[in-house]
């Protein structure tokens, strides 16, 4: 390797593992290193992480990527960070030690605080300012919980001795050895404390939750130099940290969804659908979240987001729970050999229903079984349930935004399933564009970092770098498509009726 060649490093800090990926100028992955870290479950429904273990895992993968590639720290032009969103850390400003475990986005331990806010009638005020629904999912209730449960924390926070941050903030603080306390628009927008219209921390919400402003990081754009790594923490390199975005927003950017009306879906454990709505903020009237997609070059692009709780994990359930398949990839072949007429519906509401239903009491159900139903039919119906849920969200997005969606850009593990992608195109009646490079989250962070230091000249230059790998076009006729979808809506309705209290 010539020492002249320069690269961008993306740090992708996820819910179960941390990764460091090195990209070249063509947006190709040169090296990557991954390390899992422990999940902590103090009680049912609670999920926590040790923030120091997260930091250790990040240091370890940075080293791993250097070792695998023989690239030196000095060859890294810039670092981009992308992270699991909403997960909350509160630490001591002097010692740098967290005062409690990080409370993870999925954790329900703060649900009573969220319920109280709803009962007190704050739903509309919080929705109008933050674009979010009141839920334990977002950081606000998590900060309040830590301040309530750690002795003396409230008083220390008021004195300015404690700092709060989502994972992006924590990593920048550690990489710069405590010199920089910042977050970006996309992460701030998920705290339920940030006014996304006025682009500032919201005094009314902070007062309501009694969260001292002194704890909060400064909010910056998604593409600018926030600070440099301390050589001690980056194996001798002083490298600008110059791009940052929450994981789903980074994927939106990595999918090059720069124009209003462009939509991406990441098929992970759950499924996250984000639509760029441009520079106008559009409050959802139908239970989608309004959030910030990204802010770059002085302009903020807003977005609508719908989350589906169960997508890829429905395939894992077929494998681990029902043992119908040995590997996830086997689901495609089995579904392909099903001869049924798609009359079986699986509603995988294992943890309730996400957008646009938000029904936490619903549980999974199956409809349309006959004596002739086979394992193949069941596997196919489970795959189709992912596509039906995506249509629920896409239809809602079209209503909220008034924009006709022409194409869905896809990435994530289950996007490799051709049968699912074809059925997705059919049930939506639009084209599905699968990215050539499915590492869109890390790539998005790398793009944001590289743009800000001139490694890439412009967003136009990026458009050449992640072309569509494969296009799936709708082939199903309209009447069949609508008949199938009507059956799905009936199945969901019946599932909700079954979950109602007697």
Curated annotation (Swiss-Prot):
Molecular function as annotated in GO: ATP binding; glycerol kinase activity
Pfam families linked: FGGY_C, FGGY_N
Keywords on record: ATP-binding, Glycerol metabolism, Kinase, Nucleotide-binding, Phosphoprotein, Transferase
Protein name: Glycerol kinase
Domain of life: Bacteria
Protein family (similarity comment): Belongs to the FGGY kinase family.
Cited SUPFAM superfamilies: Actin-like ATPase domain
Residue numbers binding glycerol: 85-86, 137, 247-248
Reactions performed catalytically: glycerol + ATP = sn-glycerol 3-phosphate + ADP + H(+)
CDD domains associated with the record: FGGY_EcGK_like
Post-translational modification (record): The phosphoenolpyruvate-dependent sugar phosphotransferase system (PTS), including enzyme I, and histidine-containing protein (HPr) are required for the phosphorylation, which leads to the activation of the enzyme.
List of residues binding ATP: 15-17, 269, 312, 316, 413
InterPro entries documented for this protein: ATPase_NBD (IPR043129), Carb_kinase_FGGY (IPR000577), Carb_kinase_FGGY_CS (IPR018483), FGGY_C (IPR018485), FGGY_N (IPR018484), Glycerol_kin (IPR005999)
